[in-house]
Amino acid sequence: MENTSLRSCRKDGVVYARGATDDKGQLLTHLLAAEAWMKTIGDIPLNLIYLIEGEEEIGSPHLEEFILEHREKLQADVVVISDTSQFGPEMPALCYALRGLTYMEFIVTGANQDLHSGMFGGIVPNPNQVVAAIVAEMKGLDGRIRIPGFYDGVKPPEGWEVAEYEKLPWNDSDLAAQLGLPGLSGEKEYPAPVRRWYRPTLDVNGMYGGYAGKGAKTVIPSIAGAKVSMRLVSGQNPERVAELFEAFVRERVPDDCKVEVIRYQNSPAIIIPVDHPAMQAAKVAFRNGFGKEPLLIREGASIPIVAFFVDTMKMPSILFGFGLPDDNPHAPNEKFTLADFHRGIATSAHFMDVYSEAAG
């Protein structure tokens, strides 16, 4: 179904709306769980603090400052965040690890203005080609990243983690077909779940320079650039990776060009101990709310505020995901299945019950 308007609608047990699953709908499960508890039982056996902010999609530039300003009021024993998803329909999952993120841009400048390729081709540098050459050297077609030192600290999954991802109904061919691809790519010596969750990545998010409009324009651009994101895993230091990236770029820019390297974001990978009392309570809550044992999975994406809660605030954080991978977050037809919405409410209520007993 396409829901191109900004108004929500409901059809066949599904709510279609902007933010339905990312993240207003998932947030609402926790509010409604508390409301249901107070209406049916009475006082909630925990002190709850709800922290709601709307800048996550632009990197939450003010959130850390706000939390530090109100540190005493916001200090808690555990943080619950619902910004992940189930593994699939009827497959509830607890996420125990997130990849980190280092986001970089580099801008190469040649002449002080765009030039005519007939008049100046062969005697001036072309920033487009410099950027293309550097980007091509960063990562091979085999998926291997060529920046020296990039993989320092990367560890393979532990035995219990292998056992967990081998439980998953993972099908490379089905996923590739869903994405319109003949097959999955990357480091073929590693299974797809390992490449997606346990291995770091480097992806060129955008390149610019010169003329890319309709028709022809024989221009040698003055500037060109690329934006690159690197998803990091436990054992990698984001600042160190940024330094390695910058050194790699600067060493390859010819003397007849200048380069500017910009660092946008650095956040470390996070691993949440699965034996933490809050994680154990969450497993029971999912079992009661969804009627089945949750899978233990990692997530290839990053939620920078989780690292802040864990490393700076010293507050363990757990990730409840009630939506589905195909809920189309950010798209016009973003959705949230009502059955999962209701099970999410129940799971949140069960967590309050179980964790309050575990915490004493």
Question: What kind of feature is each model-predicted range?
Answer:
Residues 1-49, 343:
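Active-site metal-coordination/substrate-binding segment of hydrolases
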Residues 15-17, 112-118, 213-214, 329-331:
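Short small-residue beta-strand/loop micro-motif enriched in glycine and branched aliphatics
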Residues 18-25, 57-58, 93-94, 119-122, ...:
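Alpha-helix capping and helix-loop boundary segments enriched in small/acidic/polar residues
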Residues 32-39, 133-137, 230, 350-353:
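Short glycine/serine- and small hydrophobic-enriched flexible loop segments
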Residues 45-126:
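Histidine/acidic-residue-rich, glycine-tolerant segments that coordinate divalent metal ions
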Residues 88-89, 146-223, 231-244, 252, ...:
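An extended, acidic, His-containing surface patch that forms the Zn2+-binding/catalytic region
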Residues 105-109, 137, 207, 227-231:
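Residue-level recognition of well-ordered beta-strand positions that form the cores
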